[in-house]
């Protein structure tokens, strides 16, 4: 069981690093930072997968994983002398809820084509809200480390 979890984690991390690297290339990230974008995307997606595996819902798992991405990205930006967004934006993209958003949009199309049904409406609302909460948690999670770590005056 442990080996299958480790294999699934490794597979998840490798498959998450590929789109993180691709979006980093689309965003013209400097060549020296590309491997860090891929590594950060793999770490974020892998940590979210582990949290989901151990019973956490996808929304708070996405929040915690994006907070982790933001904190590591800020530390790496100081080390590599680049803006944190260079690392964090491309790294968080593999965690966007494509399946939930796609299912919600398919339900909208089926409602307009076939007419209203309670099952389609329920599917649409459920998947739309799930996708919205995941995107919200990703954006909040990316912004919180900057608010915490760049604060100049005391909190009290």
UniProtKB/Swiss-Prot annotation:
It is found in: Cell inner membrane. The keyword ATP-binding does not apply. It is a multi-pass membrane protein. Keywords: Cell inner membrane, Cell membrane, Membrane, Transmembrane, Transmembrane helix, Transport. InterPro entries: ThrE_2, ThrE_Dicarb/AminoAcid_Exp, YjjB. GO terms for biological process: succinate transport. The chain crosses the membrane at residues 7-27, 54-74, 86-106, 128-148. Coiled coil: none annotated. GO terms for cellular component: plasma membrane. Belongs to the ThrE exporter (TC 2.A.79) family. The transporter is composed of YjjB and YjjP. PANTHER family: SUCCINATE TRANSPORTER SUBUNIT YJJB-RELATED, UPF0442 PROTEIN YJJB-RELATED. Involved in succinate export with YjjP. Both proteins are required for export. This is Probable succinate transporter subunit YjjB. It comes from Yersinia enterocolitica serotype O:8 / biotype 1B (strain NCTC 13174 / 8081). The gene is yjjB.
